[in-house]
A protein has these predicted regions:
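Sequence/structural signature of beta-propeller domains
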Residues: 1-332
């Protein structure tokens, strides 16, 4: 989600503010790139791993160490990319055609979870066939499987009051754009954003209503673990919820799209603590939170926070930050 027309945008920053608009009318300007860091954080290399796609958003590292990149358009695809840039990226139409925001993988149950960034978006899962990802196999082929949509017992708003049961229903036409094939009894989520699977739990964010949701895949329940509209001090500090990442200890790191341009830590007990804030880039958004293998460095982007070619910052080129993190996250 970093606009700027590739090399041309970096050469002529004045073009960056209209990058997203032009991509709407001229698809294929998107893609994904890789940065290679040394153990000390020094950048050693950079290269493209995906190109000629449109509005690439979040993604995920697969258990077999490739990268999945999501296209955020109504006919969007998920693409599998070689992180070394050797093999050509390949589209994965079996995972559905919709405004893909993010994807998470439960390798134990062999299930993919996906968010849809639309005001009337749904929450999806994709279950590969036994032949596509056999038990004991190191990876899925991602060619054949079942696309399903989340259904909640009663009103999905009941999840504000505690866990409610959910089930899955098969997509009506899995090979067509899902905006044209809505199932009326499936749960509606206002702007699906980041999603993360860990320890039988699936967390995902919805930006339209500033909520963080949790699926308990063992109990088959869903609940809201954060809601800006009902949050009280000191926890009412998180808005514009967007990309999410989890630590091995169960904390959810939520990046803000706008809001106060913060990364906020949501602890398992429900407590919220701001980790960092970017000042002076209110028209940007934070995304792409990732950690170095030793856990000592955190990387994240400000998608439109860079020079805009008009003597200032904001609505400009993307920026990448490195944060040297403490041994423990702040808890006060």
């Amino acid at each position: 989600e970093i606009p700027g027309f590739g090399t041309l945008g970096f050469t002529v920053p004045e073009l960056a503010p209209v990058g997203n608009l032009l991509e709407t009318f001229s698809p294929g300007l998107g893609g994904a790139s890789a940065l290679v860091f040394g153990p000390d954080g020094t950048i050693e290399d950079s290269y493209r791993i995906l190109q000629n796609t449109t509005f690439n958003c979040a993604g995920v590292i697969t258990p077999w160490k490739t990268w999945l990149s999501c296209e955020e358009i109504p006919t969007g695809l998920v693409w599998e990319c070689d992180p070394f840039g050797i093999q050509a990226a390949r589209p994965l139409p079996a995972l559905g055609l919709f405004s893909h925001e993010a994807v998470a993988i439960d390798s134990e149950r062999r299930v993919f979870y996906m968010t849809e960034d639309m005001p009337d978006g749904r929450f999806y899962r994709w279950v590969p066939t036994a032949g596509d990802w056999p038990a004991g196999a190191p990876r899925a082929n991602m060619n054949q499987g079942l696309l399903q949509v989340l259904k909640v017992e009663g009103d999905v708003a009941n999840a504000l009051n505690g866990p409610v049961r959910y089930s899955w229903v098969n997509a009506a036409n899995p090979n067509a754009p899902q905006t044209e094939n809505r199932l009326p009894d499936t749960a509606v989520f206002d702007g699906g954003e980041g999603v993360w699977y860990q320890n039988d739990r699936v967390f995902f964010a919805t930006k339209g209503d500033d909520r963080l949701w949790m699926l308990n895949t063992t109990a088959q329940t869903i609940e809201v673990v954060y809601d800006m509209a009902t949050a009280t001090a000191p926890n009412n500090i998180l808005s514009g919820v967007d990309n999410i990442t989890m630590t091995p200890f169960g904390e959810v790191l939520v990046a803000e799209d706008g809001g106060s341009m913060q990364v906020v830590v949501v602890y398992p007990d429900g407590k919220l603590v701001p980790l960092l804030q970017i000042v002076g880039q209110d028209q940007s958004e934070i995304a792409g939170i990732a950690f170095s293998p030793d856990g000592k460095r955190m990387y994240f982007t400000s998608d439109r926070g860079g020079p805009n070619g008009q003597g200032g910052y904001g609505l400009g080129l993307g920026m990448l930050y490195e944060l040297m993190i403490p041994d423990t996250l702040p808890n006060a």
